[in-house]
Amino acid sequence: MTLADTIFKENIKKIMEQGVFSENARPRYKDGNVANSKYITGSFAEYDLSKGEFPITTLRPIAIKSAIKEVLWIYQDQSNSLELLNDKYNVHYWNDWEVGDTGTIGQRYGAVVKKHNIINKILQQLEANPWNRRNIISLWDYEAFEETDGLLPCAFQTMFDVRRVDGDIYLDATLTQRSNDMLVAHHINAMQYVALQMMIAKHFGWKVGKFFYFINNLHIYDNQFEQAEELLRREPSDCHPRLVLNVPDGTNFFDIKAEDFELLDYNPVKPQLKFDLAI
């Protein structure tokens, strides 16, 4: 069993057995009912990517390509435009969070990256001094939140650090999320930011190191309990999936494309499970 599958099962079991129920929940299901959840707080996981430990479960299929395309939309295009996400990447799951008839998700994610020139600043800082301890992406922008409606960012902070080991430089990353839908989005979010970590490492010709993942509120929605029990019953596949980025070292961050990524040795358990999302 992979580390990711072990952590996934442990978290599901902990939420189901020790979690508490939300109150006054904001989200709604498509039928209009309140989307309450069972949750735990303070979830942490550590993966050593350099040793082949990737945060993706084999207990159900995970849509990696669309997840990576979302990262490109946020950090390369630096956009909040749903038209761009739909037309350029053929990714449509953000459409449910459109703000009014604006065609956007509000001043969120890519709009905040562009507003503060975040990615260019991170790349410039790492180039000037890789060992500086100030490489932080923060999407938590109160001014932007007051400017428009929109879903507040779930994965809102990423920190980067480097280590030199036996002459090689390794890039580590720490992702912080305020909230995470354990069954649906956990591995999507984790692998998105592993992809971002890999892109930055490639830009400088470094190796990927460790990925640290902290979630403040890790939850399972109350219409997903049957799926949770099914996942606990499933036996993981005998495979060890790993994500690779097939571009030369030194490839410019902004030149990397979704098709440059390849998920190897991934044979997840089927059938896929269905989930009614909370909006």
From Swiss-Prot:
Gene3D superfamilies: Thymidylate synthase/dCMP hydroxymethylase domain. Its main location: cytoplasm. The active site is at C154 (nucleophile). Pathway: Pyrimidine metabolism; dTTP biosynthesis. GO terms for biological process: dTMP biosynthetic process; dTTP biosynthetic process; methylation. Signal peptide: none annotated. Pfam families: Thymidylat_synt (PF00303). DUMP binds at R133, R134, R178, S179, N180, D181, N189, H219, I220, Y221. (6R)-5,10-methylene-5,6,7,8-tetrahydrofolate binds at D181, A278. One of its GO terms (cellular component) is cytosol. It is found in: Cytoplasm. It comes from the Bacteria. It catalyses: dUMP + (6R)-5,10-methylene-5,6,7,8-tetrahydrofolate = 7,8-dihydrofolate + dTMP. The keyword Transferase applies. One of its GO terms (molecular function) is thymidylate synthase activity. Its EC number is 2.1.1.45. InterPro entries: Thymidate_synth/dCMP_Mease (IPR045097), Thymidate_synth/dCMP_Mease_dom (IPR023451), Thymidate_synth/dCMP_Mease_sf (IPR036926), Thymidylate_synthase (IPR000398), Thymidylate_synthase_AS (IPR020940). PANTHER family: THYMIDYLATE SYNTHASE 1. Catalyzes the reductive methylation of 2'-deoxyuridine-5'-monophosphate (dUMP) to 2'-deoxythymidine-5'-monophosphate (dTMP) while utilizing 5,10-methylenetetrahydrofolate (mTHF) as the methyl donor and reductant in the reaction, yielding dihydrofolate (DHF) as a by-product. This enzymatic reaction provides an intracellular de novo source of dTMP, an essential precursor for DNA biosynthesis. Belongs to the thymidylate synthase family. Bacterial-type ThyA subfamily. Homodimer. NCBIfam families: PRK01827.1-1 (NF002495). This is Thymidylate synthase. It comes from Streptococcus sanguinis (strain SK36).
